[in-house]
Design a protein with these regions (language model features):
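Bacterial N-terminal signal peptides
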Residues: 8-17
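Boundary at the C-terminal end of the N-terminal hydrophobic targeting segment
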Residues: 20-23
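Bacterial N-terminal signal peptides that target proteins for export
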Residues: 1-9
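Conserved SGNH/GDSL esterase-like catalytic core that processes O-acyl groups on lipids
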Residues: 25-30, 35-123
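Active-site segments of SGNH/GDSL-like serine hydrolases
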Residues: 101-105, 128-153
Length: 153
């Protein structure tokens, strides 16, 4: 139910801020880690949240999944999102709306030691999308903390 509330709030904001009668589909880029990518879920292409969002929004929108498993916002993290081909493709897409769901992997112990750089690195990522020719609306999705099995790092 909580998930539906979040989706509902997002959709209200989306419809208020974007004209849904545009002749070209509104391009939505879903930026993120394995949660966005849909890792480990059955029938990922249909069940990941970007695919579900596409089904919900319909033909007036083109939602693309730019999720990359294990990625961080932190440029000093073990796998920075900004160093991926997926990131480059998301910029080339010139989205009208950008949903950013990153931060979970940043909370891993090996990455969180750079926590003082998190805010600046996040702002840099936001600014990069904000400065695209398409001038997209940017929506930040709250990251969840990474929970690792006891004894692993």
């Amino acid at each position: 139910m909580k998930k539906l509330n979040h989706i509902g709030i997002f959709l209200v904001c989306l419809f208020i801020t974007i004209q849904s009668f545009a002749s070209e589909p509104i391009r939505v880029a879903c930026i993120g880690n394995s949660i966005t990518y849909g890792a480990f879920i059955p029938n990922r292409e249909m069940n990941c949240y970007p695919a579900q969002l596409q089904a919900y929004l319909g033909d007036g929108y083109e939602v693309k999944n730019f999720g990359a498993s294990g990625r961080t916002i932190l440029s000093k993290g073990d796998y920075p999102y900004s160093e991926t081909d997926t990131y480059k493709a998301s910029l080339e897409y010139q989205p009208d709306i950008v949903l950013i769901k990153l931060g979970t992997n940043d909370t891993k112990p090996q990455n969180w030691k750079y926590k003082n750089e998190f805010k600046d690195n996040y702002q840099t990522l936001i600014d990069t999308y904000r400065n695209l020719k398409s001038h997209p609306r940017i929506i930040l999705l709250t990251p969840i903390r990474c929970f690792l099995p006891e004894g692993s790092e």
